Curated annotation (Swiss-Prot):
InterPro entries: ACT-like_dom_sf, ACT_dom, CheY-like_superfamily, DUF5612, UCP006363_ACT. This is Uncharacterized protein MTH_1235. Residues 5-77 form the ACT domain. It comes from the Archaea.
Length: 218
């Protein structure tokens, strides 16, 4: 059995997703990831990652035979293309410095065949930051979260605790006032070094282990 990633272009109307997933389920194929959106031309787009496929060509032919399906394309999975994700959240000045370190280190590992991608969002405000932290748990393939700011606590700290508890995501924080440093897995003073260490913590091609430094400050 094999795995496959498909992008399916469809007409945009109710019931299309149900029809497509019905075809897939009838073959005992497992859907491991799905993403739906409407393209600029008004057509529906469904991206799916599937596993336990006995006959890939037969599945694709069945999908193409549907009157609601306009096109089907095969891809490598997002895990294979973009790999693990590191999310950097906080103030713009700090986020940019953390991103510099993370991108430089990710480049070293990606050259060796690994795939690590860096996502950033500069935000201010306790409520906005807490909401963004909680939303990290709903994003796919997130391996680490870096909190890059000058003061974080309260609702942000509670959001970090939730993300760690429910999604087992490594959290690295810059050294700053506020209680968030008490719940982070690692606290780093230099923002560029924080970015570097976030990549080292999740890379399969690194010898660094977050377990050996968990709870420490640098």
């Amino acid at each position: 059995m094999t795995s496959v990633a498909l992008s399916i272009k469809t007409v945009e109307r109710p019931g299309v997703l149900s029809e497509i997933t019905g075809m897939i389920a009838s073959r005992n194929i497992n859907i491991t990831y799905a993403h739906l959106y409407v393209e600029r031309d008004g057509h529906g787009a469904i991206y799916m990652e599937l596993e336990d496929i006995d006959d890939r060509e037969s599945l694709i032919n069945e999908l193409k035979s549907s009157s609601t399906v306009l096109d089907v394309k095969i891809h490598r999975s997002l895990e294979e293309i973009y790999g693990k994700r590191i999310i950097i959240i906080g103030g713009g000045a700090q986020v940019s410095q953390v991103a510099m370190g993370a991108i430089s280190e990710a480049d070293r590992h990606n050259i060796r065949g690994e795939r690590i991608s860096i996502d950033t969002i500069p935000l201010v405000g306790e409520e906005e930051l807490a909401e963004a932290v909680r939303a990290v748990g709903r994003l796919p393939r997130v391996a680490a979260l870096v909190l890059a700011g000058s003061l974080m606590g309260g609702e942000i700290t509670r959001a970090v605790e939730m993300v760690k508890r429910e999604h087992d995501i490594t959290v690295i924080s810059l050294n700053m006032p506020g209680s968030v440093t008490d719940v982070a897995d690692l606290v780093v003073t230099d923002p560029i070094q924080a970015g570097v260490m976030s990549v080292m913590a999740v890379a399969d091609t690194a010898v660094f282990s977050i377990e050996k430094v968990r709870g420490k400050k640098f």
